[in-house]
Design a protein with these regions (language model features):
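Short coil/loop residues immediately preceding or within conserved phosphate-binding loops
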Residues: 19, 79, 107-109
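Active-site helix/loop of acyl-thioester processing domains in fatty-acid/polyketide metabolism
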Residues: 52-72
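HotDog/MaoC-like acyl-thioester-processing domains
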Residues: 1, 71, 88-95, 99-134
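Non-catalytic linker/capping segments at the edges of enzyme domains
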Residues: 1-35, 39-41
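A short coil-to-beta-strand element that immediately follows conserved catalytic motifs
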Residues: 74-77
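Short, charged/polar surface micro-motifs in flexible loops or helix N-caps
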Residues: 39-42, 60-61, 90
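A short interface-forming secondary-structure element
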Residues: 38-50, 54
């Protein structure tokens, strides 16, 4: 089984991903796109998506982009930085596109853009992952 097929299968088994109804729309070397609906159960009282939910969707895209760079294993996030630019409203789809921007011997750095249905940038993230021990 190739790594990309293995990762696609793995994504479908993610318990939190299933809870978020997340979909892996694109997976290729160094890039992943994950989409999830911003349902009412993921909102704060003001009717916008809770920041941790947006971060989780960004993290899923980032880790799957990062995992395309290693032959096996998972990669723990060691640092996450997120800037929230615009709210994501109930019923919108959160779409996170992650790209690997640095790939060294011990870590992978990703850059993530999260957009809503209107195509506008809602959040940006930089997420650093540790590579598995060899």
């Amino acid at each position: 089984m190739t790594r990309l097929i293995e990762l696609r299968t793995r994504f479908g088994q993610e318990p939190l991903g299933r809870l978020l109804q997340a979909r892996l729309e694109v997976l290729e070397d160094g890039r992943a796109v994950v989409a999830a609906p911003a349902g009412p159960e993921l909102m704060i009282v003001d009717g916008v998506a809770q920041g941790g939910v947006i971060t989780a969707v960004a993290d899923y895209a980032a880790v799957y982009a990062a995992m395309t760079r290693v032959p096996a294993g998972c990669m723990p996030a060691v640092q996450i930085s997120v800037n929230f630019l615009r709210p994501i409203g109930a019923g919108e789809t959160m779409r996170a596109e992650a790209r690997v921007v640095s790939d060294s011997r011990s870590q992978v750095v990703t850059s993530v853009e999260v957009r809503g249905d209107d195509g506008k940038l809602k959040a940006v993230a930089t997420i650093l992952f540790a590579k598995p021990s060899r």
